[in-house]
Amino acid sequence: MDQKARIKIDGVIVCEGKTDQAKLQQIFDVDVITTNGSALKKETINLIKKISEKQTVILLLDPDQQGKKIRSKLEQHLTNYYNCYVDMNARLKNAKKAGIAEMETSALIAALNNRVAITKNANQSILWDQYLSLKLNDKKKRLLLCNNLNLPYFNHKQLFKKLNLLNLTFQDVWKHLK
């Protein structure tokens, strides 16, 4: 894509490395901060936290175990941000890795179009008893719900936490299960 055809994104995207940054800036007109992979420094976390107080922060990390660890670490420090998830199977045909730099352009555009707003508050939007009544201990139901919400698959307890981070109520979750 040439400079004129890049898609404008408001906010700042957080990704893992320089090759991810280069790929994202080929496609999008956006500011990017890199975590330098698992070498995530306290200074970088503080920078991202400060930026999140003034503008939109979008976490677009690799869909591998390392990306999940980095996302989890950042989530501990942020209160308002967006999560983007890319399907690991959306990588380029000859790619050996499954990082953002190796993803199909269409998958990255879709991930940003389906970004999920996260706002942490002290109150739970769905209670554990309500969650249990939805029978989400069934893996098929969790997969259905995650697909309908454009989220990656989460285990039982992780999904409960994510639903609260998304501020989804019992009624919201019920609608997405139909």
From Swiss-Prot:
Reaction(s) catalysed by this chain's protein: Endonucleolytic cleavage of RNA, removing 21 and 42 nucleotides, respectively, from the 5'- and 3'-termini of a 5S-rRNA precursor
Name of the protein in question: Ribonuclease M5
HAMAP family: RNase_M5
GO CC entries: cytoplasm
Entry's family note: Belongs to the ribonuclease M5 family.
Enzyme superclass (EC): hydrolase
Gene: rnmV
Recorded GO MF terms: metal ion binding; ribonuclease M5 activity; rRNA binding
Principal location class: cytoplasm
Keywords: Cytoplasm, Endonuclease, Hydrolase, Magnesium, Metal-binding, Nuclease, Ribosome biogenesis, RNA-binding, rRNA processing, rRNA-binding
Protein's organism: Mycoplasma genitalium (strain ATCC 33530 / DSM 19775 / NCTC 10195 / G37) (Mycoplasmoides genitalium)
Source taxon at top rank: Bacteria
EC number: 3.1.26.8
Pfam families registered for this protein in UniProt: DUF4093 (PF13331), Toprim (PF01751)
Record-listed Mg(2+) 1 binding positions: E16, D62
PANTHER family for this protein: RIBONUCLEASE M5
InterPro entries in the cross-refs: RNase_M5, RNase_M5_C, TOPRIM_dom, TOPRIM_RNase_M5-like
Compartment(s): Cytoplasm
